[in-house]
C-alpha cells in the first residue's frame, strides 16, 4: 500500500554516490540502433588494473559497477562483466552492453548527442598525460529521417589494455577499426586522428590507421585515437603502450652484424640498409602468428545468429629454444568458447561462438596476444555477427520472411509476435493486472500495475480503507542501536491517538561513546590554555573508564575569531597533538559569548559521529554567554543538538556559566560543570556523564533518556505526545519498553503531503517517523466507442494514492430509448442505483437499435472510507456503420388464369425505397425455371430473367397459366442497398392454387346386351381433384321391356333375385361415390325381355357432381338389344413389358386391344368393336391418352392408345392392368404390363450465399457452398473467376491464384489484406463477384452423362468499418513554474493527423489548459465534452505556481493527469487514454554545509561539499564558478587503498556530475595565513535547475610552524679542497679523510631568540666534532650523548666535522641527522646527511720475466712465452679484465690476423673469448685464474718477422666508489717482443716486411670485427643483473686502436661480480 516510500528511499540512496577512481588501462565503446531509431544499444569495453578493484584475483563473469553518461543529461550505472583476467600483468577487461532511449524526434528530424565515459585518473607513471583524466566519447546520431536499415551505426575498434612496444625500435601497427554498418556498394572511409593523448614521436596515417612509433624512453605511454566515419559519427580508442628493452642482434648489413643490440642506434654503419619507419637495424626473434589458420588482420570472421559454425583457429609459434607459446584472447564476448588444440613451441586454439541473441548483432574488433614468456606479439580479429536473411528458421518468399510460429515477419523473424517472449518466442505467462515483458529480448515477466503483486499480478496488495486501522506499516530495527525502532512508517486512520512502542536498551557499559571536545583557544593567558592542553589526555582517560574499549574522540576549536574549526574528526587518536600544534591564539576580547553559535555550528558539521554511539560534545568556553542570549540562537542550538542527538556538556574553568546554565535548562537537556582549578577540570568530565548533580535532570547525561523533537519538524502537528524522561541509574544492562510516543491525524491537514518527523533522545539516537494516511480517490473519466447496433464492454477506472481497493457507483443512467448498461450477470444497472461495483466488474453497453447520438453516464469512486470529491464521466460514441438491408419472407397466392402482383419486401436504415434494389440475379435460377412451368413472371411488361433489376416500389406480375394441384414454389432472393450491401436470404413463396375442374362423365358409350334378367352396366366419372361424386340421373328411357335399376349399396351384382333393387328414374341421385385413382363408378343393371335385336333400344343420361358442386357434362349410355344369342368373351392382347427413362414426360404409344370370336355389335360393320378398360392404373405414374397431354387414360374403344408417364423423380418398376369388353359386356381376362423406369442423371444444384466480411472480421470465415444433387451424386465445385481486389482462399487457407481451381470440400474464404491500397478509394467498401461451376460425378451415360450447374455467380462484399483512431498513454515533461504547448498522441489510418481532434473528459486539477494561440482562453468544464473538440497541437498546459511532482503524495508525480479520446473526421472515438504531466520540480539542490571553513596553516584541508536534493530533484551536480586563488583548490579523487589523489583545478568554472557529495582539497600557500584568505564560489544544479550562488570563505589559521633545516655544503679537510654544495643529502669522501659539514636553520615565524641546532642521533661509526676555527685541525668539542647541540657560528651557520674510523670505508657509511628547534620548542623536520667513505682505487701492474722480454722462434713452430704475471693490489674478490693480442713491432697497435700469427693459452677458470679472425683473446676473471691462464702463452707464426705480444689489464674500477666507478677504471699495458725466423733451408723471395705489411693491411679491414667478439665475451661475463658491462670494461692507456677507445656511453652494474676463484 505504501510501496512508493520504498521507491523513494531507493531513489535517494541511488543518488548518494561516491567519487572513486582507479588505474584504467584501456577503453572504447560502440553504438547501434536496435528496433527503434532512438533506442541505442551501447557496447562498452574497458580495461583496469586488477588490484585497484579486487583484493583477490577475480574470475570471468565477475563484475564491477560503472557509470555512463549518455549526453542527454542522463547518467546510469551498469555492470561491467569481466571478459579477460591477466594475473601476470595485473589487468582485466570487461564489457557492458546496455540500451538507452533518447528523446523522440519528429519524422524527418535528426539529433546528435555526445555520450561519454569518464574517470579519474590515469596512472602516475605514464610518460605522457600522467594523472590525467580519462575520457572516451562518441557522437551518437539519432535519425528519424531514414528507415531503420539506413540509420548510421558508429565505427567499432578494440585494443589490448597494454600494447607492447620495443624501446629504440620501430613499432608499426594498425589501429584496428571497422565501419560496422556499410550498405551494399559502399566502402569504408574511416579517418584516424589523435586525441589529446599522444606520445612524443608517434605518428598516425589518418587514412589507414597505421601507427609509427619509436619510443625514446622505457616505460608507459598512453594514446587516444579518434575514429570518424564519413557521416561524422566517431568513437574514441584509448590505450596504454609499454615500452620495454628487448635484446636483439644487428642486421647483417651492419658493420657489427650479429652483434647483440637493444635499439637501432646500437647498430652502426649498416651500409645501404635504411631503417626508417618500416625497417629496423636491431632485430629480435619473436613469436609469430601462423597465417593461416590465424585470420589475417584484414580478414573478417562472420557468425550468423542462430546458425551452427566451426569457429576459427589461431596458431602461434616461436623459434626460441626451450620456450613454449601461450595464446590469450582479450576481451572476447562472454559467449566465446576457447578450446586448446595444441600446446608447446607451437600453440593452437579454437575460438567458437554460437550467437543467439539480437544483442549480439554487430561488429567486434578484438585482440589476441601470443607470448613465449619473453616477448609478446598481438594480432587483431574483426568479427561480424549477422542476422540471418530470415532468422530462426524462416525463409523469404517474394521478399517477405515467412516465419516460424510466434515470430514476426516485420522483424525478419528476429522478434516475437505480440504476446511471446524470449529467444524461442514462447507464450508469455498469464499477466492479469500488468504488462508482460514480451519480445525476443524480454523475459516474460509480468510487471504489475499499481496495487497488484504476484508472478501474474493477480494478488492485490491493496485493501479497502474501511478495513484499515492505525498501525505500523514498516519499521527498521538496528540491533546495535540504543533506541529502537530507528525508523518507522505509521498509517493514521483517524484522529484517535496511536501509541508507538519504544524500546530502550542501555548496556552495562555503553558499548560506543563518541566525545567531541570543543575548546575555546582564546584563553586569557597562555598558562590557562596550557593547563587545558595538559589535562586533555587525563580527561580522555577519565572518559575511557566509562567504556574502556569503545570511546572515540574528536577535537574542534573556537578560534581567535570566535569561529568553529574542526581539527580532528571522530575517531582521532591525535587530538592532543592537534591541540598542541594549534597553540594558544592570544586573548581576543572581541569574541566574548560566541561559544553558543560555535557549538551550534559544530553540531551541524559532519564530525564523523559513529552510528549507534552515544554522542556528546564537551564545550569548554572562555566566557559565559551574554546575559540575554538571542532566543533564535538558543532555538537553533537546541534544534541542532536534538537533530543530531548530541548531549552537550559545558565545562567552565575559572568562569561563571550562569547564562549557559539557564540556556541548557531552557533547552531541557545537557550538563554543566564549574572548575575553579584549571588543572582540575579533568576530574569533572566523567562526573558530567555520570553522578553529577549539575545537569538539567540532576544526574549525568549518560543516565538521562530525554526525548525531544526538533521544533522545525514538518510533522509536528501529527505528534500528540512523547515519552517522559527516563533516568537510568543502574550499572547493569537496562532494557525498557516505553510508551508515550503517540500520533494522530490532525483535523485539518494537507492531504497532498505525508510529513516526516524525528523524535530524538539526547545522545542515544533518534526515531525517524514517516506518516501516512488516507486520501480521497479519484475516478478516471474515459470514453468508449462501439459500432452501430453493437455492444461494448468496459470497466470503471479510478486511482488512489493510497493503493486502496476502489469500488464505484453510477450517479446517472441511460434512458430506455438510448441504450442499456448491464452487469456481468445481465442486470440493468439502472435498477440498482445505489450499488457499489468492484473495479473488476465488466459492464456491457448496448445502444438502442440504430441509435447514433453520443451518450454519457457519471460515476464516483469509493475507497471504503472516502468518496471521490467529484464524479467522472464515461462517454459513449457510436460509430455509424452502414446497415445491411433487411428483407422479409412472404407468400403470394395465385389462381389459375389470373394475374397477381406483389413486391419483394425489404427495408434499409439508411436508404429510401428508391435506392433499395433487388436484383433478380440473386434469385436461384432453378427456382425461377420451376415457377415458369406454371405461369408467367413479368416486371414492367418484360419477362423476369436473372438480369432484371427490380426496384422495391415497382410491382412484379405473375399470371398462373397452369392449373396443377396446389403447390408452393419458392423464390429465394436478397436485397441490396445503395452501398452495395446485401441482405440475408429471404424467400418469396408463390402459392400456386389449383382451380377446381368439373368432373368428366364418360359420354357416347354404346352397350349391346342380349335379352337377360340383369346385365351390369357402369356409369363412369373422372375427376383429378375430387374425392367423391354425386351421380344424378337426368333421363331414363328403358325401352318397352327394359328396366334400369340399382342396388341400395351401389354395388349391384345384377343377378336374378336381387331383393334390394331400386328402379332408376329421372333425377335419381347417388352420393358419396368415391373416386379411386381419379375414377368413380356407379354400377347399375339393365334388364329386358326383347327377343330380337333392337338398336338404340334404351338409354340413360347422367352427370356427376364433385365435392365443390361442379357438375360434369351430360353423358348418355345407349343400350342396343340383340335378343337371345350366345356370346364368346373377347381375348385381350398382352402388351409386352417395356421401359422408359426417369422424368421423361411420356413413353412411346402403347395400345390396349383384343380379339372377339363372334360378332357382338348390333351393326355388323362394327364387328369386334371392343372396349378397352384400364382395370388397375400404374402406381408410380399415369397413363394419358395424348402424348404430352393431361387426359387420364381410363377406357376407350379398342384399340385404345395410351402413353405412360412416370411420376417426377421416380425410378424403378411400375405396372398396370387392362382388359377388353365386348358389346355384350363380356370381359376378357385381365393382363398386366410391367414398366421399368430407368434412372437418369440429373443436373446438380448450387446455392451461393452472399459472402460478407468487414475490416473488423479478421481472417475470413470459411463458407461452404450449399450444393444438392437429386441422384445423390457427389458435387464437385470449381472457382471459375476470382473477385477483384479481394483474395480468395480455400478451406486450408491457401490462396487461389489461378482459375479454374477445384475447391476442396467446396469451401472457401476471402481476405482483404490492406485496405489502404483499395482502388479507386482507399479504406472503402469492395463489392465484387466470382463464379462457381459445379459438376456431379455420375457414372450414368444414357441419355445424359455428367452434368454441371453452369457458371453460377457469387457475390463477395468487403465492408470497411471506420477504424477508431489510436492513442497512447503519454507523458508531458516540463519544469515547475513554466508552461508547455504539448501534443496529444493520435493517429488514424484513414485520416491525416491534421484532421484529428481531441475530446477531453477531464481537466487538470493542479494546473490549467489554455489555447496555445490565445492563452486567455482557459478551458473550463463548460468548454469540454460534447461537441467541443480541439486540435492535437492546440493546447498549452500550465501548472499552478510552485506546484510540481514533489507536491504529490509520493513525490513521484505526475502532478496532473487528464483523460481524452481522439476523434476522427467521421466522429469515431479512440479508446480513452490519459496524458500525464510530469512537472519536474524547480527546487534546486541545497547546500547546508559551512559557509566558512578554518584551515590550518600549511595543512591540506579535505573539503567535502554535500548537496541535498531539492524537493523533487533528481540529481545534485556542482559547478565551481570561481576561486580567489591564493591557495590551491583541487578535486580529490579516492584511489581506494592507495588513498586520495588531488588534481589541481586549473580552469573555472569546473564541473562535476553524478554524486551528491563532492570531494575537494584546499592547500594554503606555504607559510601564509589570515582571515578571509580565499573565497570559493559555486552553485549546485540539477540538470538545468540552478541553485543560488554559494560562497565558502577560507580562513587560514596561523599555526606555529616548525623551523627548517638546510644542508648547505661540505669540504674535505685533508685535501684542502674547495667547498662543495650538497646535492641532495649525500657526501662522498675518501678513506682516512675528514669532512667539514655546513648547515643552516630558518623559521618563518618571528623569532625573538635564536634557533638551536643539534645532531638528533649520533652515527654508529665515526666521530663528530664541533668546528673550531682557532684549532689547527679545526676540531672543537666532540658531539656526543652528553651534548648534542651544535654551537652557532658567527656567520649564522652551524658547522660539524665528521671523522670516519681509520681505514674503514663503505657506502652509506654514516647517517648524521640534524634538527633545529625554535623558541617554542617546535622541532624542524630532520635533515640527514648520508656519508659515503670511499676506498682509493690502486693501479694494476704487469710483470715481465727478468730473464728476457724477447722470445725467438721459427715459422710454423710454437714459441712458449712464460714468466708473465699481472697484479691489482685492491682486486681481491672481484674480477678484472685482460686482453692478450699480437701486434706488429712498430708503434702501431693493429692486431694481426690469424693468417699471419696465432695465439693461445690455457683457459682454465676465467671467461675467455678468442677472436675468430684476429690474434686476440679477451678474458674476465680473478687475478689468480688469469695468472694461471697466462703462465704459458703459445704463439705460432706463419710468416717470419718481428712482433709484439701485448697484454692490457683493466681493474674495472671496482675498488672505486660505485658512483664514480665508470670514471675510475685503472689499467696497465705490457709488451713482449717476438721474433720469428724462416727455417734455415728455405729460400724466401719476398721481403718479410713487405709480406707482413700486406698482411697487416689486409687485417686492418676487419679490425672493426673485433668489437663483436669483445661485446659477446663481455656480455656473457656480465653479472646477472638488468644491465651489463660495455666497452668501458676495456678502458686503459691504449688509444691508438679503436678497439681500446673509451666509450662515451659506458656504464656498469651496481652489483659487484664476484671473482670466480
UniProtKB/Swiss-Prot annotation:
Interacts with talA/talin. PANTHER family: INTEGRIN BETA-LIKE PROTEIN E, STABILIN. It comes from the Eukaryota. It comes from Dictyostelium discoideum. This is Integrin beta-like protein D. The gene is sibD. GO terms for biological process: cell adhesion. It is a single-pass type I membrane protein. Its main location: membrane. The keyword Disulfide bond applies.
Amino acid at each position: 500500500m505504501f510501496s512508493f516510500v520504498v521507491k523513494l528511499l531507493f531513489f535517494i540512496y541511488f543518488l548518494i554516490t561516491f567519487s572513486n577512481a582507479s588505474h584504467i588501462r584501456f577503453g572504447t565503446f560502440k553504438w547501434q540502433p536496435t528496433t527503434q531509431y532512438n533506442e541505442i544499444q551501447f557496447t562498452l569495453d574497458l580495461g583496469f588494473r586488477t588490484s585497484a578493484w579486487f583484493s583477490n584475483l577475480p574470475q570471468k563473469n565477475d563484475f564491477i559497477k560503472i557509470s555512463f553518461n549518455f549526453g542527454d543529461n542522463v547518467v546510469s550505472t551498469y555492470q561491467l562483466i569481466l571478459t579477460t583476467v591477466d594475473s601476470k600483468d595485473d589487468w582485466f577487461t570487461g564489457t557492458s552492453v546496455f540500451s538507452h532511449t533518447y528523446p523522440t524526434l519528429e519524422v524527418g528530424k535528426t539529433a546528435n548527442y555526445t555520450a561519454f565515459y569518464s574517470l579519474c585518473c590515469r596512472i602516475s607513471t605514464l610518460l605522457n598525460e600522467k594523472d590525467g583524466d580519462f575520457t572516451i566519447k562518441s557522437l551518437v546520431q539519432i535519425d528519424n529521417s531514414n528507415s531503420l536499415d539506413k540509420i548510421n551505426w558508429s565505427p567499432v575498434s578494440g585494443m589490448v589494455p597494454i600494447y607492447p612496444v620495443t624501446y629504440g625500435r620501430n613499432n608499426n601497427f594498425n589501429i584496428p577499426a571497422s565501419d560496422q554498418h556499410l550498405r551494399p556498394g559502399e566502402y569504408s572511409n574511416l579517418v584516424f586522428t589523435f586525441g589529446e593523448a599522444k606520445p612524443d614521436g608517434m605518428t598516425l596515417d589518418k587514412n589507414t590507421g597505421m601507427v609509427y612509433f619509436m619510443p625514446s624512453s622505457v616505460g608507459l605511454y598512453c594514446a587516444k585515437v579518434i575514429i570518424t566515419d564519413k557521416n561524422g559519427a566517431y568513437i574514441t580508442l584509448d590505450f596504454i603502450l609499454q615500452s620495454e628493452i628487448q635484446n636483439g642482434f644487428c642486421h647483417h648489413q651492419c658493420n657489427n652484424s650479429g652483434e647483440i643490440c637493444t635499439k637501432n642506434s646500437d647498430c652502426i654503419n649498416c651500409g645501404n640498409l635504411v631503417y626508417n619507419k618500416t625497417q629496423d637495424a636491431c632485430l629480435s626473434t619473436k613469436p609469430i602468428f601462423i597465417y593461416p589458420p590465424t585470420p589475417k588482420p584484414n580478414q573478417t570472421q562472420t557468425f550468423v545468429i542462430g546458425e551452427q559454425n566451426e569457429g576459427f583457429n589461431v596458431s602461434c609459434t616461436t623459434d626460441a629454444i626451450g620456450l613454449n607459446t601461450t595464446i590469450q584472447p582479450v576481451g572476447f564476448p562472454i559467449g566465446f568458447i576457447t578450446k586448446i588444440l595444441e600446446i608447446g613451441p607451437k600453440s593452437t586454439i579454437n575460438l567458437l561462438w554460437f550467437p543467439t541473441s539480437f544483442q549480439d548483432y554487430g561488429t567486434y574488433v578484438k585482440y589476441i596476444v601470443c607470448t613465449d614468456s619473453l616477448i609478446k606479439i598481438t594480432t587483431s580479429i574483426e568479427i561480424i555477427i549477422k542476422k540471418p536473411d530470415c532468422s530462426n528458421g524462416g525463409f523469404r518468399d517474394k521478399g517477405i520472411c515467412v516465419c516460424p510460429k510466434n515470430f514476426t515477419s516485420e522483424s525478419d523473424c528476429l522478434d516475437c509476435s505480440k504476446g511471446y517472449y524470449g529467444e524461442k518466442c514462447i507464450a508469455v505467462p498469464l499477466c492479469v493486472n500488468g504488462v508482460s515483458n514480451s519480445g525476443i529480448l524480454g523475459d516474460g515477466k509480468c510487471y504489475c500495475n499499481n496495487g497488484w503483486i504476484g508472478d501474474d499480478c493477480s494478488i492485490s496488495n491493496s485493501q479497502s480503507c474501511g478495513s484499515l486501522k492505525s498501525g505500523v506499516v514498516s519499521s527498521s530495527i538496528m540491533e546495535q542501536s540504543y533506541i529502537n525502532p530507528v525508523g518507522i512508517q505509521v498509517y493514521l486512520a483517524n484522529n484517535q491517538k496511536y501509541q508507538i512502542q519504544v524500546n530502550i536498551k542501555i548496556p552495562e557499559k555503553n558499548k560506543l561513546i563518541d566525545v567531541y571536545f570543543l575548546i575555546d583557544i582564546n584563553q586569557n593567558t597562555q598558562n590557562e590554555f596550557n593547563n587545558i592542553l595538559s589535562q586533555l589526555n587525563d580527561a580522555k582517560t577519565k572518559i575511557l573508564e566509562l567504556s574502556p574499549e569503545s570511546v572515540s574522540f574528536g577535537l574542534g576549536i573556537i578560534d581567535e575569531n570566535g569561529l568553529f574549526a574542526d581539527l580532528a574528526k571522530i575517531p582521532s587518536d591525535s587530538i592532543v597533538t592537534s591541540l598542541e600544534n594549534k597553540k594558544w591564539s592570544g586573548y581576543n576580547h572581541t569574541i566574548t559569548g560566541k561559544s553558543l553559535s560555535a557549538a551550534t555550528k559544530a553540531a551541524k558539521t559532519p564530525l564523523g559521529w559513529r552510528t549507534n554511539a552515544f554522542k556528546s560534545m564537551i564545550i569548554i568556553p572562555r566566557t559565559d554567554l551574554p546575559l540575554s542570549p538571542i532566543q533564535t540562537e538558543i532555538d537553533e542550538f537546541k534544534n541542532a543538538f536534538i537533530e543530531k542527538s548530541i548531549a552537550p556538556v559545558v565545562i567552565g574553568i575559572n568562569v561563571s556559566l550562569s547564562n549557559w546554565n539557564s540556556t541548557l535548562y531552557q533547552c531541557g537537556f545537557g550538563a554543566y560543570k564549574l572548575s575553579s582549578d584549571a588543572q582540575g577540570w579533568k576530574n569533572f568530565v566523567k562526573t558530567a556523564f555520570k553522578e553529577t548533580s549539575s545537569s538539567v535532570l540532576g544526574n549525568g547525561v549518560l543516565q538521562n533518556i530525554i526525548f525531544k523533537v526538533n521544533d522545525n519538524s514538518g510533522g509536528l502537528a501529527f505528534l500528540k505526545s512523547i515519552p517522559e524522561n527516563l533516568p537510568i541509574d543502574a550499572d547493569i544492562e537496562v532494557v525498557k519498553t516505553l510508551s508515550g510516543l503517540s500520533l494522530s491525524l490532525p483535523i485539518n491537514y494537507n492531504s497532498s503531503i505525508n510529513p516526516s518527523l524525528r523524535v530524538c533522545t539526547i545522545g542515544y539516537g533518534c526515531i525517524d517517523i514517516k506518516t501516512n494516511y488516507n486520501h480521497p480517490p479519484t475516478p478516471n473519466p474515459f470514453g468508449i466507442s462501439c459500432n452501430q447496433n453493437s455492444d461494448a464492454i468496459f470497466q470503471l477506472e479510478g486511482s488512489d494514492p493510497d493503493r486502496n481497493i476502489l469500488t464505484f457507483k453510477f450517479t446517472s443512467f441511460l434512458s430506455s430509448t438510448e441504450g442499456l448498461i448491464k452487469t456481468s450477470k445481465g442486470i440493468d444497472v439502472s435498477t440498482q442505483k445505489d450499488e457499489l461495483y468492484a473495479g473488476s466488474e465488466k459492464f456491457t453497453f448496448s445502444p438502442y437499435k440504430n441509435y447514433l447520438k453520443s451518450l454519457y453516464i457519471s460515476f464516483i469512486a469509493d475507497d471504503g472510507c472516502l468518496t471521490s470529491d467529484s464524479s467522472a464521466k464515461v462517454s459513449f460514441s457510436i460509430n455509424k456503420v452502414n446497415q445491411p438491408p433487411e428483407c422479409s419472407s412472404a407468400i403470394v397466392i395465385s389462381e389459375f388464369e389470373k394475374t397477381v402482383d406483389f413486391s419483394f419486401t425489404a427495408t434499409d436504415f439508411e436508404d429510401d425505397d428508391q435506392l433499395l434494389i433487388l436484383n433478380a440475379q440473386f434469385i436461384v435460377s432453378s427456382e425461377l425455371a420451376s415457377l415458369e412451368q406454371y405461369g408467367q413472371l413479368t416486371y414492367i411488361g418484360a419477362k423476369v430473367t436473372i438480369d432484371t433489376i427490380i426496384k422495391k416500389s415497382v410491382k412484379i406480375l405473375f399470371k398462373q397459366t397452369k392449373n396443377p394441384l396446389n403447390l408452393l414454389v419458392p423464390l429465394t432472393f436478397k436485397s441490396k442497398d445503395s452501398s452495395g450491401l446485401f441482405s440475408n436470404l429471404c424467400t418469396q413463396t408463390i402459392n400456386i392454387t389449383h382451380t377446381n375442374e368439373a368432373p368428366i362423365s364418360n359420354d357416347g358409350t354404346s352397350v349391346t346386351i342380349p335379352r337377360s334378367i340383369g346385365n351390369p352396366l357402369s356409369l363412369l366419372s373422372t375427376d383429378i381433384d375430387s374425392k367423391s361424386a354425386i351421380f344424378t340421373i337426368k333421363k331414363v328411357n328403358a325401352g318397352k321391356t327394359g328396366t334400369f335399376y340399382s342396388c341400395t349399396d351401389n354395388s349391384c351384382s345384377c343377378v336374378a333375385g336381387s331383393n334390394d333393387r331400386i328402379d332408376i328414374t329421372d333425377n335419381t341421385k347417388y352420393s358419396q361415390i368415391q373416386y379411386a385413382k381419379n375414377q368413380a363408378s356407379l354400377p347399375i343393371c339393365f334388364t329386358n325381355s326383347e327377343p330380337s335385336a333392337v338398336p338404340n333400344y334404351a338409354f340413360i343420361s347422367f352427370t356427376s357432381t364433385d365435392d365443390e358442386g361442379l357438375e360434369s357434362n351430360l353423358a348418355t349410355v345407349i343400350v342396343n338389344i340383340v335378343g337371345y344369342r350366345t356370346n364368346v368373351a373377347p381375348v385381350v392382347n398382352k402388351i409386352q413389358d417395356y421401359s422408359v427413362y426417369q422424368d421423361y414426360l411420356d413413353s412411346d404409344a402403347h395400345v390396349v386391344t383384343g380379339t372377339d370370336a363372334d360378332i357382338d355389335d348390333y351393326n355388323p360393320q362394327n364387328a369386334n368393336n371392343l372396349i378397352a378398360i384400364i382395370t388397375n392404373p400404374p402406381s408410380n405414374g399415369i397413363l394419358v391418352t395424348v402424348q404430352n397431354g393431361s387426359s387420364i387414360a381410363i377406357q376407350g374403344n379398342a384399340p385404345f392408345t395410351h402413353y405412360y408417364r412416370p411420376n417426377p423423380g421416380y425410378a424403378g418398376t411400375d405396372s398396370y392392368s387392362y382388359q377388353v369388353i365386348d358389346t355384350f359386356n363380356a370381359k376378357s381376362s385381365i393382363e398386366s404390363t410391367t414398366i421399368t423406369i430407368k434412372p437418369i442423371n440429373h443436373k446438380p444444384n448450387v446455392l451461393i450465399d452472399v459472402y460478407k466480411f468487414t475490416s473488423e472480421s479478421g481472417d475470413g470465415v470459411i463458407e461452404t457452398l450449399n450444393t444438392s444433387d437429386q441422384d445423390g451424386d457427389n458435387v464437385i465445385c470449381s472457382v471459375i473467376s476470382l473477385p477483384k481486389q479481394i483474395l480468395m482462399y480455400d478451406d486450408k487457407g491457401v490462396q487461389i491464384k489461378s482459375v479454374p481451381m477445384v475447391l476442396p470440400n467446396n469451401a472457401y474464404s476471402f481476405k482483404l489484406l490492406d485496405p489502404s491500397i483499395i482502388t479507386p478509394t482507399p479504406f472503402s467498401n469492395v463489392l465484387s463477384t466470382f463464379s462457381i461451376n459445379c459438376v456431379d460425378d455420375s457414372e450414368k451415360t444414357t441419355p445424359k452423362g455428367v452434368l454441371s450447374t453452369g457458371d453460377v455467380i457469387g457475390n463477395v462484399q468487403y465492408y470497411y468499418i471506420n477504424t477508431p483512431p489510436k492513442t497512447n498513454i503519454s507523458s508531458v515533461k516540463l519544469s515547475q513554474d513554466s508552461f508547455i504547448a504539448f501534443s496529444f498522441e493520435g493517429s488514424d489510418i484513414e485520416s491525416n493527423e491534421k484532421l484529428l481532434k481531441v475530446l477531453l473528459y477531464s481537466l487538470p486539477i493542479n494546473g490549467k489548459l489554455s489555447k496555445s494561440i490565445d492563452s486567455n482562453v482557459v478551458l473550463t468544464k463548460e468548454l469540454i465534452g460534447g461537441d467541443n473538440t480541439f486540435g492535437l497541437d492546440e493546447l498549452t498546459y500550465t501548472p499552478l505556481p510552485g506546484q510540481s511532482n514533489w507536491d504529490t503524495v509520493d513525490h513521484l508525480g505526475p502532478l496532473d493527469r487528464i483523460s481524452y479520446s481522439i476523434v476522427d473526421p467521421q466522429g469515431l472515438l479512440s479508446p480513452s487514454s490519459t496524458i500525464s504531466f510530469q512537472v519536474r520540480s524547480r527546487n534546486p539542490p541545497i547546500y547546508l554545509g559551512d559557509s566558512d571553513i578554518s584551515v590550518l596553516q600549511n595543512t591540506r584541508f579535505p573539503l567535502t561539499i554535500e548537496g541535498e536534493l531539492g524537493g523533487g530533484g533528481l540529481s545534485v551536480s556542482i559547478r565551481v564558478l570561481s576561486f580567489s586563488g591564493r591557495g590551491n583548490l583541487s578535486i580529490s579523487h579516492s584511489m581506494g587503498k592507495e588513498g586520495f589523489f588531488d588534481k589541481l583545478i586549473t580552469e573555472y568554472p569546473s564541473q562535476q556530475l553524478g554524486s551528491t557529495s563532492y570531494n575537494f582539497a584546499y592547500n594554503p600557500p606555504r607559510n601564509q595565513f589570515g582571515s578571509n584568505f580565499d573565497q570559493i564560489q559555486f552553485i549546485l544544479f540539477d540538470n538545468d535547475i540552478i541553485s543560488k550562488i554559494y560562497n565558502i570563505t577560507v580562513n587560514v589559521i596561523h599555526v606555529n610552524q616548525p623551523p627548517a633545516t638546510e644542508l648547505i655544503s661540505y669540504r674535505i679537510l685533508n685535501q684542502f679542497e674547495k667547498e662543495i654544495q650538497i646535492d641532495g643529502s649525500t657526501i662522498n669522501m675518501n678513506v682516512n679523510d675528514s669532512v667539514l659539514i655546513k648547515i643552516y636553520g630558518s623559521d618563518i615565524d618571528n623569532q625573538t631568540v635564536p634557533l638551536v641546532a643539534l645532531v638528533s642521533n649520533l652515527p654508529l661509526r665515526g666521530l663528530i666534532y664541533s668546528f673550531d676555527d682557532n684549532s689547527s685541525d679545526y676540531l672543537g668539542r666532540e658531539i656526543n650523548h652528553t651534548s648534542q647541540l651544535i654551537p652557532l657560528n658567527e656567520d649564522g651557520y652551524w658547522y660539524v666535522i665528521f671523522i670516519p674510523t681509520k681505514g674503514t670505508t663503505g657506502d652509506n657509511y654514516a647517517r648524521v641527522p640534524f634538527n633545529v628547534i625554535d623558541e617554542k620548542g617546535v622541532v624542524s623536520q630532520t635533515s640527514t646527511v648520508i656519508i659515503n667513505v670511499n676506498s682509493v682505487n690502486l693501479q694494476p701492474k704487469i710483470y715481465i720475466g727478468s730473464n728476457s722480454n724477447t722470445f725467438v722462434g721459427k715459422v710454423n713452430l710454437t714459441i712458449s712465452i712464460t714468466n708473465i704475471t699481472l697484479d691489482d693490489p685492491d682486486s681481491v674478490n672481484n674480477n678484472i679484465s685482460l686482453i692478450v693480442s699480437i701486434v706488429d713491432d712498430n708503434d702501431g697497435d693493429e692486431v694481426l690476423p690469424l693468417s699471419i700469427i696465432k695465439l693461445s693459452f690455457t683457459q682454465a677458470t676465467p671467461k675467455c673469448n678468442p677472436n675468430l679472425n684476429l690474434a686476440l683473446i679477451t678474458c674476465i676473471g680473478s687475478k689468480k685464474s688469469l695468472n694461471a691462464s697466462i703462465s704459458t702463452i703459445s704463439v705460432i707464426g706463419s710468416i717470419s718477422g718481428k712482433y709484439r705480444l701485448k697484454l692490457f689489464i683493466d681493474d674495472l674500477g671496482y675498488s672505486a666508489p660505485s658512483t664514480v666507478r665508470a670514471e675510475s677504471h685503472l689499467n696497465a699495458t705490457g709488451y713482449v717482443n717476438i721474433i720469428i725466423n724462416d727455417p734455415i733451408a728455405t729460400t724466401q723471395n719476398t721481403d718479410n716486411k713487405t709480406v707482413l705489411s700486406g698482411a697487416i693491411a689486409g687485417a686492418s679491414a676487419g679490425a672493426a670485427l673485433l668489437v663483436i667478439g669483445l661485446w659477446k665475451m663481455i656480455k656473457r661475463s656480465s653479472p646477472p643483473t638488468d644491465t651489463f658491462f660495455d666497452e668501458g670494461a676495456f678502458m686503459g692507456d691504449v688509444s691508438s686502436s679503436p678497439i681500446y677507445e673509451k666509450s662515451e656511453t659506458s656504464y656498469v652494474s651496481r652489483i659487484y661480480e664476484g671473482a670466480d676463484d
